[in-house]
């Protein structure tokens, strides 16, 4: 099986656009630095084409074995494609154990099928950064920050809850001093007038507008009775039994003689109905008054 079986044809449309964008991110200066580093560690020459020299995975496996001895147990020297893919897979497993993050590692086809050389370069740079943290002298990449663990007493941790972090912004030394709870009264006055602070609760600041001397004096709670009269007429206060003329007139009507709602009432007209008379106990009904209840004819 020849290696041409794994070579892809030219890309078109969106695939070509994505491939071009990835190729534009490839850094040739970083490639030269990685070449010098790998050749210096392994002692083997990669070749003119950097990615083609790493494609069989042999140099990559020897390289990780130099950084971490025993990482790859067997390196396949065969030119068959599946042996070369196995070398690349073993290299990926080895650098994962070495400490490179999974999201920084390329896939085997990115190198073997030439689909994403930029990701391969990013993986080698991440490997260089990890090698620096392990004490290797590397001039490529950026050294990862080392952990600086600290242990604090529980009392110190509780004190930290009272501090506002600068990452959350600053209150510019503002505080809640002088603030009252929501809904409580506030003393409002205009400090520009030079007056003292008011002692009563009826002062309204001029900054809030003016009430023109209005107050709530004489006002009653909602639903209570109000005495309504016209002060211009010079009359005294009306009592609660009279209805103001402004509200209309009841024409002398009252509730006299009215009973409680639901009680029985005797309804008759005295012009047409006689006063009912009932026979006494034991008296025959026919011997009673001719205009009694039973014999009114």
UniProtKB/Swiss-Prot annotation:
The keyword Phosphoprotein applies. GO terms for biological process: actin filament organization; actomyosin structure organization. The modification Phosphoserine is found at residue 175. The modification Phosphothreonine is found at residues 170, 180, 184, 259. It comes from the Eukaryota. This is Calponin-1. Calponin-like repeats lie at residues 164-189, 204-229, 243-268. Belongs to the calponin family. Coiled coil: none annotated. PANTHER family: CALPONIN. GO terms for cellular component: actin cytoskeleton. Signal peptide: none annotated. Pfam families: Calponin, CH. Residues 28-131 form the Calponin-homology (CH) domain. Thin filament-associated protein that is implicated in the regulation and modulation of smooth muscle contraction. It is capable of binding to actin, calmodulin and tropomyosin. The interaction of calponin with actin inhibits the actomyosin Mg-ATPase activity. Keywords: Actin-binding, Calmodulin-binding, Phosphoprotein, Repeat. It comes from Bos taurus. One of its GO terms (molecular function) is calmodulin binding. The gene is CNN1. The keyword Phosphoprotein applies.
């Amino acid at each position: 099986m020849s290696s041409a079986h794994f070579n892809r044809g030219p890309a078109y449309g969106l695939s070509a656009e994505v491939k071009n964008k990835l190729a534009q991110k490839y850094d040739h200066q970083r490639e030269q630095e990685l070449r010098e580093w790998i050749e210096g560690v392994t002692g083997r020459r990669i070749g003119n084409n950097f990615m083609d020299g790493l494609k069989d995975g042999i140099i990559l496996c020897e390289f990780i074995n130099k950084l971490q001895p025993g990482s790859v147990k067997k390196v396949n020297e065969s030119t068959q494609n599946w042996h070369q893919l196995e070398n690349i897979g073993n290299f990926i497993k080895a650098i994962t154990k070495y400490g490179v993050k999974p999201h920084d590692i390329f896939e085997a086809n990115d190198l073997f099928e030439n689909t994403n050389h930029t990701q391969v370069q990013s993986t080698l740079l991440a490997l260089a950064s990890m090698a620096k943290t392990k004490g290797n002298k590397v001039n490529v990449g950026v050294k990862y920050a080392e952990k600086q663990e600290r242990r604090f007493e529980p009392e110190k941790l509780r004190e930290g809850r009272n501090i506002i972090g600068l990452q959350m912004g600053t209150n510019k030394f503002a505080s809640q001093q002088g603030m009252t709870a929501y809904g409580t009264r506030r003393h409002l006055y205009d400090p520009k007038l030079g007056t003292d602070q008011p002692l009563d609760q009826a002062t309204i600041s001029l900054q809030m507008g003016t009430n023109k001397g209005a107050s709530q004096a004489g006002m009653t709670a909602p639903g209570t009775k109000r005495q309504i009269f016209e002060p211009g007429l010079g009359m005294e206060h009306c009592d609660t039994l009279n209805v103001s003329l402004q509200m209309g007139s009841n024409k002398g009507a009252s509730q006299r003689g009215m009973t409680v709602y639901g009680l029985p009432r005797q309804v008759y007209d005295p012009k047409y109905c006689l006063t009912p008379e009932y026979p006494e106990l034991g008296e025959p009904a026919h011997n009673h008054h001719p205009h009694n209840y039973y014999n009114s004819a």
